[in-house]
Swiss-Prot record:
<dbReference type="InterPro" id="IPR007561">
    <property type="entry name" value="Cell_div_SepF/SepF-rel"/>
</dbReference>
<feature type="compositionally biased region" description="Polar residues">
    <location>
        <begin position="27"/>
        <end position="41"/>
    </location>
</feature>
<dbReference type="InterPro" id="IPR023052">
    <property type="entry name" value="Cell_div_SepF"/>
</dbReference>
<feature type="region of interest" description="Disordered">
    <location>
        <begin position="25"/>
        <end position="70"/>
    </location>
</feature>
<dbReference type="GO" id="GO:0043093">
    <property type="term" value="P:FtsZ-dependent cytokinesis"/>
</dbReference>
<keyword id="KW-0963">Cytoplasm</keyword>
<feature type="compositionally biased region" description="Polar residues">
    <location>
        <begin position="54"/>
        <end position="70"/>
    </location>
</feature>
<protein>
    <recommendedName>
        <fullName>Cell division protein SepF</fullName>
    </recommendedName>
</protein>
<comment type="subunit">
    <text>Homodimer. Interacts with FtsZ.</text>
</comment>
<dbReference type="Pfam" id="PF04472">
    <property type="entry name" value="SepF"/>
</dbReference>
<keyword id="KW-0131">Cell cycle</keyword>
<keyword id="KW-0717">Septation</keyword>
<dbReference type="GO" id="GO:0000917">
    <property type="term" value="P:division septum assembly"/>
</dbReference>
<keyword id="KW-0132">Cell division</keyword>
<dbReference type="GO" id="GO:0005737">
    <property type="term" value="C:cytoplasm"/>
</dbReference>
<comment type="similarity">
    <text>Belongs to the SepF family.</text>
</comment>
<comment type="function">
    <text>Cell division protein that is part of the divisome complex and is recruited early to the Z-ring. Probably stimulates Z-ring formation, perhaps through the cross-linking of FtsZ protofilaments. Its function overlaps with FtsA.</text>
</comment>
């Protein structure tokens, strides 16, 4: 399988029904923007051009790693602080936000609620299956970074909770054949 085919399949994963036209238009625009006044005498072989790019990208990766680790450390400290404040003030009522996302762009708002240490019940009944899978994929990534939990409640509903919330899934009576573990496959309902 060629590299181009892999990129096409990767892009196809993120495209939806109406996005195919936009992707084709963006490819045409990118080709039109490329400068055409390069001189053949100054062109270097392809091997020489690729090597400096690999070196520069690896050096950028090394410089970005400490800042990302610093961000994760600060985020973890903030979550611990919120967890301690929450355990001290146990008399407060706990609320669970219920969200009905209609498009993939609603996912960052749900992650913002998780970042604010709130539990969210998400019902994907108004989304297509492709959009719902993409949204679940996005939420799973956020869950991993924020150390939260993502549990399946029913065929189209998922419960996203912060690290300090414990969900006893046995109390939720699921019908036979429905698993509570996270799964990208929404076809199994």
């Amino acid at each position: 399988m060629s590299l181009k085919d892999r990129f096409d399949k990767f892009i196809e994963y993120f495209t939806e029904d109406g996005d195919d036209v936009q992707v084709a238009e963006s490819r045409v625009q990118q080709q039109a923007v490329k400068p055409s006044n390069s001189r053949p005498a100054q062109q270097e072989p392809v091997r020489d051009i690729k090597q400096p790019r690999l070196v520069s990208s690896s050096s950028q990766h090394v410089t970005n790693t400490p800042s990302s680790n610093e961000n994760i450390t600060r985020l973890h400290a903030r979550q611990q602080e919120l967890a301690q404040n929450h355990s001290v003030a146990t008399s407060e009522k706990v609320t669970i936000d219920v969200r009905y996302p209609k498009k993939y762009e609603d996912a960052p708002a749900i992650v913002d609620l998780l970042l604010a240490n709130e539990s969210v019940l998400i019902d994907f009944q108004y989304m297509t299956e492709v959009q719902a899978r993409r949204c679940i994929d996005y939420l799973d990534g956020a869950k991993q970074v924020l150390m939260g939990n993502l549990r399946r409640v029913s065929g189209t509903m998922y419960l996203l909770t912060p690290v300090n919330v414990v969900v006893n899934i046995e109390d939720i009576k699921l019908p036979d054949g429905v698993h509570s573990e996270f799964d990208f496959d929404m076809k199994r309902r």
